[in-house]
Amino acid sequence: MSHQPLSCLTEKGDSPSESTGNGPPHLAHPNLDTFTPEELLQQMKELLTENHQLKEAMKLNNQAMKGRFEELSAWTEKQKEERQFFETQSKEAKERLMALSHENEKLKEELGKLKGKSERSSEDPTDDSRLPRAEAEQEKDQLRTQVTRLQAEKADLLGIVSELQLKLNSSGSSEDSFVEIRMAEGEAEGSVKEIKHSPGPTRTVSIGTSRSAEGAKNYLEHEELTVSQLLLCLREGNQKVERLEIALKEAKERVSDFEKKASNRSEIETQTEGSTEKENEEEKGPETVGSEVEALNLQVTSLFKELQEAHTKLSEAELMKKRLQEKCQALERKNSATPSELNEKQELVYTNKKLELQVESMLSEIKMEQAKTEDEKSKLAMLQLTHNKLLQEHNHALKTIEELTRKESEKVDRAVLKELSEKLELAEKALASKQLQMDEMKQTIAKQEEDLETMTVLRAQMEVYCSDFHAERAAREKIHEEKEQLALQLAVLLKENDAFEDGGRQSLMEMQSRHGARTSDPDQQAYLVQRGTEDRDWQQQRNIPIHSCPKCGEVLPDIDTLQIHVMDCII
């Protein structure tokens, strides 16, 4: 057992029991005794600044993540709204195209009927004048109604086609066609003069990028121009329809006048009496009636031409309808054949969810930091309140001192001065006692720190002693095992020695018995007797017990009890 002094721990820097409390075991704590207070303050300030910088970096990162998340959410909402808008537009376009197809079929049938009637009227105009009055009036009424209906349907068709073109332009399809509709000033019914299709480049909708402000402004200006042009066209068409209605009214009035004149003529023909003046008027009457009928025929032919123009415009509208149907089919194909876009959207939704979770975690961390900052703010507010109170008390004390000085200067009552002096003495005594208590506390703290240091040293030394004890115990166990082995070997050797001695004695006895007469000298007998006594003493020494204490000589039965006794005896 090796007794090491307390100074051995300071000399041995690599004790096996030393280990750091925090951090990895290969990093040791810095020795605070080597640093000065100023260096410690500087390190604390540096740590505080680094902490502040890290907080600011976390805040900036949180703000950036929020901005990205808001941008992604806005982009996804825009994508959803645009998709819904495109779907609704495609449905409306399909419905309107179906309605337009039905209306076109009806108009074709009506135009065929009108063509047949106009051809009949152009082939035999003399027969039309001979028709009965009732049939002529019915045909005129039918023509008027058909003309008004055709005009209204033309205006509706033009408006629907323009709306469809505008909606297709605004839907952002793959073939972004720009349609310009201009109305001719000299036409009677506001027919479409030019429909220009300018094929634009295909758009590639890039993820994460929004439309620029200039493009939006140009698009809005173009929409406003097209709407204003359509409104002007509709106004002109309405005005022309009103003019045609007025012209039809005038023609109707003329027809009624001619009917009256014809009735008067029939009455004049039935009468037997007539004058030459009346005959001249009668001759002039049919001529005027024929001229007016020719004018009506011209109006009918002009209306037929207008109907032909409407037919051509309807054919153009059918072509536009086919193009629109093709575009709708292309849009449907795009909407149906976009699995990759759906996968991308799913990935975006997954990333959005991840970002939402990250933002929620960051928000929770921010809330924790805000709660900590609020606690610190409350503590600071409490400290400020206490500081303000202390300042107020200090100011009050200063004021009282000033008042006392004034009273002393003015030689106020000595009793008050005595009381104040006594109070001051008591306060000084209290301060001195408190200072003494503080000094005592500092001394006790220093002693406790020293005791703690000594305790740590003692603990380390105890661990060293324990390790030495265990090492010595293991060595003793090994020595005990070796002793047992040696004892066994001794026993074997002693047995062999006894056997050899017995054999020697027997051989001696035999020799003595053989040579008894020769060796009768007394000296030789005495030598043999002495040798026998020495052999007995050596056997007695050999029979000494092995388990005995080396210090006090106490004999013990076992090696374990011997070790315990040796530890107690030595310590």
Curated annotation (Swiss-Prot):
It is found in: Cytoplasm, Perinuclear region; Golgi apparatus; Golgi apparatus, trans-Golgi network; Cytoplasmic vesicle, Autophagosome. CDD domains: UBAN (cd09803). A motif (UBAN) lies at residues 468-473. A zinc finger (CCHC NOA-type) spans 541-571. Phosphorylated by TBK1, leading to restrict bacterial proliferation in case of infection. Residues 201-210 have a biased composition (Polar residues). Zn(2+) binds at C549, C552, H565, C569. Residues 38-170, 233-502 form a coiled coil. Residues 406-514 are annotated as: Interaction with MYO6. GO terms for cellular component: autophagosome; cytoplasm; Golgi apparatus; nucleus; perinuclear region of cytoplasm; recycling endosome; trans-Golgi network. Self-associates. Interacts with HD. Interacts with GTF3A. Interacts with MYO6. Interacts (via UBAN) with ubiquitinated TFRC. Interacts with GTP-bound Rab8 (RAB8A and/or RAB8B). Interacts with TBC1D17. Interacts with TBK1. Interacts with TRAF3. Binds to linear ubiquitin chains. Interacts with LC3 family members MAP1LC3A, MAP1LC3B, GABARAP, GABARAPL1 and GABARAPL2; OPTN phosphorylation increases the association (at least with MAP1LC3B). Interacts with RAB12; the interaction may be indirect. Plays an important role in the maintenance of the Golgi complex, in membrane trafficking, in exocytosis, through its interaction with myosin VI and Rab8. Links myosin VI to the Golgi complex and plays an important role in Golgi ribbon formation. Negatively regulates the induction of IFNB in response to RNA virus infection. Plays a neuroprotective role in the eye and optic nerve. Probably part of the TNF-alpha signaling pathway that can shift the equilibrium toward induction of cell death. This is Optineurin. It comes from Macaca mulatta (Rhesus macaque). The lineage of its organism: Eukaryota, Metazoa, Chordata, Craniata, Vertebrata. The gene is OPTN.
